[in-house]
């Protein structure tokens, strides 16, 4: 009797899939950009020591935070590459133990802005960090988004 119930689906439920198994197929790696033939994009970068700017800091167009750096780059730029560019212009980012947290700032459908953290790097890593190789194109970056960099 119990055997018949199992055959008809009345037995014990199946165990869940093992942890750590990715249920979604991996996204294809974006094609590298030919930097000789492709025009760079203007990335507006806002830096702040101690934390990220708030979404209210970006609320009024034309009155964005003052600590802006404009960088011409490509969508295949990695967070490590952007870290090195920020270090060129920010004294705080050059500290030996400085940690840089990256966030995208993008408009929402309510007329304001969202701030979403996307990765973290070290100014002078003693080993490769997990987010170092993430590129703008692998992250949900769209041309026109701002990059907010918190320096700790």
Swiss-Prot record:
Keywords: Repressor, Stress response, Transcription, Transcription regulation. Residues 1-38 are annotated as: Disordered. The keyword Repressor applies. Induction: By salt, cold, drought, abscisic acid and ethylene treatment. It holds the Pfam family SAP18. Residues 28-38 have a biased composition (Basic and acidic residues). GO terms for biological process: response to abscisic acid; response to salt stress. Disulfide bonds: none annotated. Coiled coil: none annotated. Ubiquitous, with low level in flowers. GO terms for cellular component: cytosol; nucleolus. Disruption phenotype: Plants are hypersensitive to salt. GO terms for molecular function: transcription corepressor activity. Interacts with SIN3, ERF3, ERF4 and HDA19. Belongs to the SAP18 family. Links the histone deacetylase complex to transcriptional repressors bound to chromatin. Involved in the tethering of the SIN3 complex to core histone proteins. This is Histone deacetylase complex subunit SAP18. It comes from Arabidopsis thaliana (Mouse-ear cress).
């Amino acid at each position: 009797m119990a055997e018949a119930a199992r055959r008809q689906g009345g037995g014990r439920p199946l165990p869940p899939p093992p942890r750590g198994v990715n249920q979604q197929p991996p996204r294809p790696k974006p094609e590298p950009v030919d930097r000789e033939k492709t025009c760079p994009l203007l990335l507006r970068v806002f830096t702040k020591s101690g934390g990220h700017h708030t979404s209210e800091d970006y609320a009024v167009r034309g009155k964005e935070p003052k600590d802006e750096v404009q960088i011409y780059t490509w969508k295949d730029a990695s967070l490590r590459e952007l870290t090195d560019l920020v270090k060129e212009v920010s004294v705080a980012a050059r500290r030996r133990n400085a940690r840089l947290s990256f966030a995208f700032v993008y408009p929402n459908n309510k007329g304001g802005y969202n701030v979403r953290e996307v990765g973290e790097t070290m100014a002078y890593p003693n080993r490769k960090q997990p987010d170092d190789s993430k590129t703008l194109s692998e992250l949900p970056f769209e041309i026109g988004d701002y990059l907010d960099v918190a320096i700790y």
